[in-house]
A protein has these predicted regions:
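The feature marks the mature, well-folded catalytic cores of soluble enzymes
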Residues: 1-238
Length: 238
């Protein structure tokens, strides 16, 4: 049986941290801070990185970290690849050009020293077909279920293909943010833990809501989150 929650995390240490203009039009939860110097924002991000890393390690969870790149403002959110417990990994297609740049050759080389690369769908970026790994797909690993909210960064057809090829059942649905557009990433609105699923059902379109509600209640206790709470990223949890 697959372990639901990992005992080993991969983190990227920020070199710089700033708003990503290339992702802003699909990410309505991103905020630009105008009254604070860029270097101060980066200092805060670095302090938060070390605080989180230390807190995780104190819980007995192993953390592997690599240094990010200044040309990649979202490098601290490494959702361009997935590793699996059978020591394989896959690389995914990213929408924003500067997110594609996150796939640094030295990072891939480092990862492939431990994990066998079995698939790389980066070529789909040229066709504007995007599937942004564990941000597009929220995994119930034990029960082999993937939850996916359709968005410009989560292509429905590619998601169906991926789940079929990797033997996962798919729970596919549509969402609507406080701005009226699809929520850019599924992991903004939900997470799957060992015993609990946290999810904001209110942002799932009514025609999909009861279907998703039944699925999340099938194997877990459910913690319902409000739309206001996910604006504060309460849906992003490990």
């Amino acid at each position: 049986m697959h372990q639901q929650s990992t005992s080993h995390l991969f983190m990227i240490e920020p070199v710089e941290f700033y708003s990503n203009e290339q992702t802003a039009y699909t990410n309505h939860y991103q905020k630009t801070v105008l009254d604070e110097a860029a270097d101060k924002i980066s200092e805060k991000a670095l302090a938060e990185f070390h605080g989180l890393k230390n807190a995780i390690e104190k819980r007995g969870i192993r953390v592997t970290s690599l240094l990010g790149s200044s040309d990649c403002p979202d490098h601290v959110f490494p959702n361009w690849f997935i590793t699996f417990d059978d020591k394989t990994m896959q690389i995914f297609s990213m929408m924003a050009p500067n997110r594609r740049e996150e796939k640094k050759s030295h990072m891939i080389q480092y990862l492939t020293e431990t994990y066998e690369l079995t698939d790389d769908i980066s070529h789909l970026e040229e066709k504007e077909i995007f599937l942004e790994s564990t941000s597009s797909m929220v995994f119930d690993r034990v029960n082999r279920i993937v939850y996916g909210g359709i968005s410009p960064r989560t292509n429905a057809v590619q998601l169906i293909i991926w789940c079929r090829n990797n033997n996962y059942d798919l729970v596919l649905f549509e969402t609507e943010s406080h701005k009226g557009s699809p929520i850019y990433h599924t992991d903004v609105l939900m997470y799957v833990g060992t015993d609990i699923i946290g999810i904001c059902l209110d942002v799932i379109k009514p025609e999909h809501r009861e279907f998703v509600r039944k699925k999340v209640n099938q194997y877990h206790d459910v913690l319902e989150l409000s739309a206001e709470q996910i604006q504060d990223f309460c849906g992003n949890a490990i």
